[in-house]
Amino acid sequence: MTAARLGALDPTVFELAARRVMARCDELARITSTPGAITRVHLSPEHARVNRLAAEWMREAGLQTRQDAAGNQLGLLPAADPEAPVLMLGSHLDTVVDAGRYDGIVGVLMAIEVVRLLQRRDDDTSGVDAPARSPFDFGLEVAAFSDEEGARFGKALLGSSAVAGTWDDAWWELEDPDGTTLREAALEFGLDPGRVSEAARRPSELVGYLEAHIEQGPELHARGEPLAVVSSIASARRFQLVVEGEARHAGGTPYDMRRDALLGASEAALAVERICSTQHHIIGTVGQFEAFPGAMNIVPGEARFSLDLRGEFDGERDRVWDQISRELDDIMGRRRLRWHTREVHNAPALFCAPLLQDVVGEGIRSTLVPGSAVDGSILGSGRPEDPTTLFSPAGHDGMAIGAITDVGMLFMRNPDGVSHHPDEAVSLGDVALGIRALAEAVAHLGAEHRRT
Ligand code: HGY
Ligand code: MN
Ligand code: MN
């Protein structure tokens, strides 16, 4: 399927595909460990159920499916040459706690629709349905990664790190809030920890990785645009911090005798906000916060909190971490407290490959064709010829996959940028445009690949 032939398709083809994607997002949203909310963490029974459902949808779209040794669900549309490398398209099916229904999920389902649209069935005189094939000199493989969020064990990108061959066996000892180790969870899920390296792919096997994702920020909504090219993905470091003071009687302990761990940690959280909010593309968030022993009439002797620190450039992010650390030394020294920390996640910034940024831009341009309107997302209505390009403060699987191949990303508008929240949304029209843009991007890459 060439870009020209895609362009000849009736826009309703993309709308029908988008309707299927939205309906399936709703169906997957019902697979949750917390009825009434959406929570689907790594190696849970819910993870197994969505992998089975995604595999069914992949097979129905003509793909050959398998679950890899790390629990990722894959669907392959081979090229005519079975030894040819593949372009990987996908996202993740795991969620944060009390999540929205599109973060990750919509990208996996859009990838299935794009591969369905692009596939070719060789004319077969025997009348038997010939197997679907990629029309390019590379195969197309849909990846439904697991554990992009790190919601269960704290370390994110576990599924895509296994594919990238950057797995660290120390992760097997990571524990979830119930004390279950990653190793125990993998065994219970039916995986063999000793074979996780079988999930790893060699650079020579891939021509690249493309991911469609909601923006998880307010930019596109504010600009009134449906789609954007992603230039780079923020680097991330995640820490668990402990502040130690002294538990004392809430009534009998005068203030000058207190070593209140909660107040020390509270000052630290405010310092994170003050330091990060004055820097460009540096984002620090304290998302978890607990005080111990946690009684109303006891001065907290210990406080535990998390820090999620991101930056456009690793060096700047690390400089800010040093600044925060110095500030914590001051705060805890003044309050006669002690603090220590454990880093649980560290992923470098990912700069999207220029070629993949270009083909995603071509894909977006293809949606500018007047008349390719879908449910009111009227196109060609004075939107800039040059597609918007955005930095992604949100993390994505491309941060891991970038270790072995080029990465490109397409953003779709999500109203007000609400994400990691049940109100997360994306419109049918923008998903239809996103499917068209992603398919066109692949077709442009196919043409480019033939030329090289
Ligand atoms: O945390 C993130 O930025 C991503 O949603 N995992
Ligand atoms: Mn997320
Ligand atoms: Mn995501």
What do the predicted segments below correspond to?
Residues 15-18, 29-30, 181-231, 269-274, ...:
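Active-site-adjacent substrate-binding region
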